[in-house]
Amino acid sequence: MTYCIGMRLNQGLVFLSDSRTNAGVDQVGTFRKMSVFENPGERMLVLMTAGNLSISQAIRQIVAEHIDSNGLSIWNVASMYDAARIVGEAVRTVHQREAKALADCGIDFNVSIIVGGQIGAERCRLFQVYSAGNFIESHDETTYFQIGEAKYGKPIIDRVITPASTLDEAAKCALISMDSTLKSNISVGLPLDLLVYEAGSLAVTRFVTIDEKNRYFRMIRDTWGEQLKSVFENMDNPVWDVAPGTDGRSLASCSTAGKPVRMTMPAQLGNTAQPTTPMQSLAQQVHNGRQH
C-alpha cells in the first residue's frame, strides 16, 4: 500500500509520498511513487501513484514517452487540464491492454493518481485521476487530494490547511499527516519524498528524501505525539453528576432521547435475571472455597 498527498495553496504546491509496496508481510519493497516532469522555466509537473505497482509503472512510462496523433505530450501541452487528460488517456491505454489478463488472474485494475504543477503563465493546478481515466480538479473548498491509505492522515489536514497556508506550514502538516499514517498502518513506510513548488518558479523549489535518520522528521514524530498527549491530559474529564446546562463539562443530557435502546426479552423466556450478589475479592473467593 502507499500514502500520497498533494496540496494546492496560494503560494504554490506541496507533494509528499511514501515508498513502500507490499504483497504480504514477507514481500515488502521500496519503490518511489513520485515522478517529476520538468522543463525549467517552461513547466514543472509532479505525478504520484497508488495502487497496483505494475499498472502505475506502465502508466508513468506512457505519460513520459507517448506523443498522440496531434503531436501532443506531457512535455508540450499548453495547460494542466490537458496534462491531466493525457494522464487519463494513459490509464485507459493500460486498462485496455492489461485489464482482462489481470481479471483472469483475479486481480483488480487498481490505480489512483495525483498530478499537479504549473505550465507557463497558467496558475498552479492539482488533479486526481481515477482508475477509469476520469479526473477532478482541486478548488479552494478542497485544497488537497490524498491517495492510498488516506484516512489516518486526513483529520489534521482538514483542521489546519487553507489556501492561505504557507508552503512551510503545508509541508509541516503533510509530514504530520504522514506520521499519523505511519503510526497506524505498517503498509506505509519510509523513505518519503517531499517536493515543495513555489508558484511562478517553473522549476522544483525544494526537494528532500526523508529516511529514519532525518532529524526534522524525527522531531515531528516525537513532538507531535508528546503535544497530543499534553493537550489530552490538560482537557477536563467529563462530569456526570451535575444537572444538564450547569457545567460545561457535563455529559448529562436534557433530551429524553439520551437513553440506551433496550431490547425486549421474549415472553416465553420468562424472567431469567439472576439475583445480584456482592462482589468478592480473590482472597475471599479462595477462603470460601476452602470452607466446602
Please report, for each region that a protein language model flagged, where it lies by residue.
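N-terminal nucleophile
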Residues: 1-292
